[in-house]
């Protein structure tokens, strides 16, 4: 069960990733976690990555692919794995394919931009406790105030509307082309491709994924 998740930030991939990991007993592979682990372990690729990062440069696709290949060969990936946030670009997807990393299912979580903006820009947090509210879905009893302490609520920088829209623009420019890439792969029989309406209730999406991936 080798899965790639696609979808804009705020489309609900993280929630479903947790569900899929628990259901199928597969690990989630994050390139950031992999880089940190490889550097800590002092592996050859880790040392190369550290040198690049220490010089303030971006880690190359070749290095990342090497790390992914190393990671998916580990024991806990025997039953499969879940890739979220990678590949991000067509060259990365091509390089993955060329290096023999097989993908069984590509799941695209489709949510309109305006819904994502509402979801994320509507969040308010109480910095002292970490309590999270939402102007639409879970509003505080008193506008702008924490229910328990009465302190002012704030907006996380990542949830500012301008930031959300900027991240969405980057997603559409860089990652959206992967939809075409993997749909073409599915047509050729290399993998299955499933588009999921991410505006549905979490439980409904859980059921849909269980049925489709059974």
Swiss-Prot record:
The keyword ATP-binding applies. It is found in: Cytoplasm. GO terms for cellular component: cytoplasm. Its EC number is 2.7.4.3. Residues 122-159 are annotated as: LID. It catalyses: AMP + ATP = 2 ADP. AMP binds at residues 31, 36, 57-59, 85-88, 92, 156, 167. One of its GO terms (molecular function) is adenylate kinase activity. InterPro entries: Adenyl_kin_sub (IPR006259), Adenylat/UMP-CMP_kin (IPR000850), Adenylat_kinase_CS (IPR033690), Adenylate_kinase_lid-dom (IPR007862), P-loop_NTPase (IPR027417). Pfam families: ADK (PF00406), ADK_lid (PF05191). One of its GO terms (biological process) is AMP salvage. It comes from the Bacteria. CDD domains: ADK. Its main location: cytoplasm. Residues 30-59 are annotated as: NMP. Belongs to the adenylate kinase family. Monomer. Catalyzes the reversible transfer of the terminal phosphate group between ATP and AMP. Plays an important role in cellular energy homeostasis and in adenine nucleotide metabolism. Consists of three domains, a large central CORE domain and two small peripheral domains, NMPbind and LID, which undergo movements during catalysis. The LID domain closes over the site of phosphoryl transfer upon ATP binding. Assembling and dissambling the active center during each catalytic cycle provides an effective means to prevent ATP hydrolysis. This is Adenylate kinase. It comes from Colwellia psychrerythraea (strain 34H / ATCC BAA-681) (Vibrio psychroerythus).
């Amino acid at each position: 069960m080798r899965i790639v998740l696609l979808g804009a930030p705020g489309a609900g991939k993280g929630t479903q990733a947790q569900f899929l990991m628990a259901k199928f007993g597969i690990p989630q592979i994050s390139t950031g976690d992999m880089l940190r682990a490889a550097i800590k372990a002092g592996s050859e690729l880790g040392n190369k990555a550290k040198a690049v990062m220490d010089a303030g440069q971006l880690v190359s696709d070749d290095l990342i692919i090497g790390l992914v290949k190393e990671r998916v060969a580990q024991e806990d990936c025997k039953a499969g794995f879940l890739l979220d946030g990678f590949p991000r670009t067509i060259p990365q997807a091509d390089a993955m394919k060329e290096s023999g990393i097989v993908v069984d299912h590509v799941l695209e979580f489709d949510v309109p931009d305006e819904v994502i903006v509402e979801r994320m820009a509507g969040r308010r947090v109480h910095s002292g406790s970490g309590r999270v509210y939402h102007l639409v879905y879970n509003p505080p009893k008193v506008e702008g105030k924490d229910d328990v302490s009465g302190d002012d609520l704030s907006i996380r920088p990542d949830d500012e509307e301008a930031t959300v829209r900027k991240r969405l623009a980057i997603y559409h420019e860089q990652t959206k082309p992967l939809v075409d890439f993997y749909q073409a792969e599915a047509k050729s029989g290399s993998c299955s491709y499933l588009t999921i309406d991410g505006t549905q209730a979490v439980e409904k999406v859980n059921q849909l994924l269980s049925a489709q991936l059974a």
